Amino acid sequence: ASDVYKRQHTPGETVYDRDCCITTDYLQALDTLGSGTQPFFSFLFYDLAHGIELSKDKLYRFKPTWEFADYMKLDNNIDPTPFLNLYYNCMAEVDSLAGCVLQKLAEKKLLDNTLVIITGDHGQEFNENHKNYWGHGSNYSPVQTHIPFLLYDPGKPSHTYRHVTTHYDFVPTLMTEVLGVTSPPSDYSMGHLLTDTCSRNWHVVGDYLDYAFIVDNHTILEKQPSGCIEISDSLLNPLEDYKIDTRKLNPEFKQTMQ
């Protein structure tokens, strides 16, 4: 096997260098992966969206901009624009690197029979809720839980869906529409088909320690370490008079624990 598949760390002094490295390595690997008839699975994780730093020569698309994420400057009153523009500049570089991969796939005619997914594992907050939250992993509001999800399927026409979906929906979609599984998604997943417009009420979001249920209009029912449930609206404002229908809550708890 290639040393690329054996290494535990990607070489490079900066986040950008390492993202460029995995792109270069993958473009070279495609010459082998795409040369035969065997199916292959590939995963590229671009870290610029997490590292949020670039050299000065890359900070030209969005201004004014910081050169790095200076978290010590952040508070509830600071103008987020320079920090947000730094993030935009980083994402523009990720977009460019992903474009190189797509171009290579096109050149090798692999887009004719390859599913391509571009997504993220979480959102990124820049104090949009005006409660001094920055980054991710600190609340379950839309700005931290909404993510892009682009699915390219060469066998289907382009379409934009505007109903609520979750990452849980991808596996049932893949199993049903690509792999030919006929069992209902409820047998193995909390998700639905991505094209299914049914309600996603009571879908689960979580981090390493806690979790929450998201219901109507992104109402957040967050389990606290004490076992209590804290209820807030999409802007993290407490909802004191919200009534929980335990007939709906209990089955969701049971499914989450399975």
Which sequence ranges carry the predicted segments?
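Histidine-centered active-site microenvironments of extracellular/periplasmic hydrolases
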Residues: 58, 106-154
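Membrane-interface soluble catalytic domains
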Residues: 106-109, 153-258
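Short glycine/proline-rich turn/loop motifs
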Residues: 6-9, 72-83, 150-156
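Active-site-proximal alpha/beta segments of enzymes that process anionic O-linked groups
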Residues: 2-70, 191
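Beta-strand elements within well-structured catalytic alpha/beta cores of enzymes
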Residues: 39-47, 91-94, 98-101, 114-123, ...
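A long, amphipathic alpha-helix that forms part
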Residues: 20-35, 67-114
